[in-house]
């Protein structure tokens, strides 16, 4: 009876588990060991992708390291310097910089090149703001000479950017079709253009009214283009003898070109120019008016080329002429050609004006001690209005800070970070 009750007790009690030496076993079962699988949080094929803040995928993000190859041909990873990373960060946000006054010129040039490579000067509003940060702080380093000869499309499309350039020494606006009412002509008499020493306005449809507006600040206030030494007004038929009188305010003028204008009394005009300014007529062509040495110089030299190429690429060539001819041939409306022998009407020949050579230069002055002493006495007793204005300008403190330059040791220290 004991044997019969034992299996019933075993069934009621259930399985008995025993752990021995870290192994779990069941008493009285055929499988002495239970295989326990490790608990996995994820399956083998599970992968995790970290998604951060969504950014603009159209912009290529530069990685903070550089790929280079060694002499053996193996690929080498080198991290960018802290200076390079900082330069890229500032160039990406150059329009938000308050001012660049006081920064060294070498760093500013690298920053300008980096911003130009990122096309930060192309945007209509932010590009102009970024460009003004450099022109206000560095002046003629951005551009000292600007040649816009025949580039009237660039003048019309980038007028505000051109007006932002300060401390220019040479400006060539020949063949730009400005006219008397152009905004850039009025800008020439402003204070930012007072550093101009060479100005070329050949073939711009100027008249006496435009010359009067351009020289108003010099004649009345004694400032503006008061440092001008070379002036080219040739090929402007609207300039007459009356317009020449407005040029007498340029006391430092050394070279003047009035060729192909509408001067009716050359002999009388020559006498006025010689007595008022001290210029005499040159029998030979003056090399200053050959336009061979005039070119764009400064940090923004490549920027102007990119502007012009962008404007020219936007202008698509007109292909309507071929389609128009094809349509005329299809409908049988070809253009009638008038035979040469049956000409009942002939166009008059264009009137060719006689070219006049009127180039003036200042001869070398011979020093006369008596005349110099008398001139000094006259200036000591009487002060002119222009002298007062110049004295006031000299007393006024300059707004621009002195430029800071880095030495070779400073560059070594900067590149070591």
UniProtKB/Swiss-Prot annotation:
InterPro entries, sorted: Leu-rich_rpt, LRR_dom_sf, LRRC42
Annotated region (Disordered), positions in chain: 360-390
Cystine residue pairs: none
Assigned protein family: Belongs to the LRRC42 family.
Record bears the keyword Thylakoid: no
Top-level taxon of the source organism: Eukaryota
Keywords: Leucine-rich repeat, Repeat
Keyword hit for Repeat: yes
Basic and acidic residues composition-biased segments: 362-375
Protein known as: Leucine-rich repeat-containing protein 42
Species, as recorded: Xenopus laevis (African clawed frog)
The LRR repeat ranges on this chain: 167-188, 195-215, 227-248, 252-273
């Amino acid at each position: 009876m004991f044997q019969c009750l034992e299996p019933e007790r075993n069934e009621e009690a259930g399985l008995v588990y025993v752990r021995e030496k870290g192994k779990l076993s069941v008493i009285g079962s055929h499988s002495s060991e239970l295989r326990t699988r490790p608990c996995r949080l994820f399956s083998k094929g599970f992968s995790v992708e970290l998604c951060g803040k969504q950014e603009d995928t159209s912009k290529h993000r530069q990685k903070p390291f550089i790929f280079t190859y060694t002499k053996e041909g193996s690929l080498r990873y080198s991290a960018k310097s802290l200076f390079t990373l900082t330069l890229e960060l500032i160039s990406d946000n150059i329009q938000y910089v308050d001012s660049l006054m006081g920064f060294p010129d070498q760093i500013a040039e690298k920053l300008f090149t980096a911003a130009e490579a990122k096309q930060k000067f192309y945007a209509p509003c932010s590009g102009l703001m970024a460009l003004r940060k450099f022109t206000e702080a560095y002046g003629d380093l951005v551009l000292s000479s600007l040649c816009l000869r025949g580039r009237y499309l660039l003048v019309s499309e980038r007028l505000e950017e051109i007006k932002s350039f300060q401390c220019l020494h040479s400006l060539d606006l020949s063949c730009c079709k400005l006219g008397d009412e152009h905004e850039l002509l009025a800008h020439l008499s402003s204070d930012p253009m007072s550093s101009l020493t060479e100005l070329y306005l050949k073939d711009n449809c100027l008249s006496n009214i435009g010359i009067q507006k351009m020289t108003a600040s010099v004649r009345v206030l004694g400032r503006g283009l008061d440092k001008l030494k070379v002036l080219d007004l040739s090929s402007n038929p609207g300039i007459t003898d009356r317009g020449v009188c407005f040029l007498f305010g340029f006391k430092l003028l050394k070279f003047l070109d009035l060729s192909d204008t509408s001067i009716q009394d050359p002999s009388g005009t020559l006498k006025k120019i010689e007595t008022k300014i001290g210029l005499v007529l040159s029998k030979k062509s003056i090399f200053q008016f050959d336009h061979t040495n005039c070119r764009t110089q400064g940090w923004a030299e490549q920027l102007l080329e990119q502007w012009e190429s962008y404007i020219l690429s936007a202008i698509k060539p007109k292909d309507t002429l071929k389609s128009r001819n094809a349509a005329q041939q299809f409908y049988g409306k070809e253009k009638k050609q008038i035979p040469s022998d049956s000409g009942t009407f002939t166009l008059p020949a264009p009137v060719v004006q006689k070219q006049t050579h009127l180039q003036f230069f200042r001869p070398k002055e011979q020093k006369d001690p008596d005349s110099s002493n008398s001139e000094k006495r006259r200036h000591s007793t009487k002060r002119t209005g222009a002298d007062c204005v110049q004295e006031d300008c000299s007393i006024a403190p300059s707004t621009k800070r002195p430029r800071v330059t880095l030495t070779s040791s400073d560059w070594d220290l900067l590149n070591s970070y």
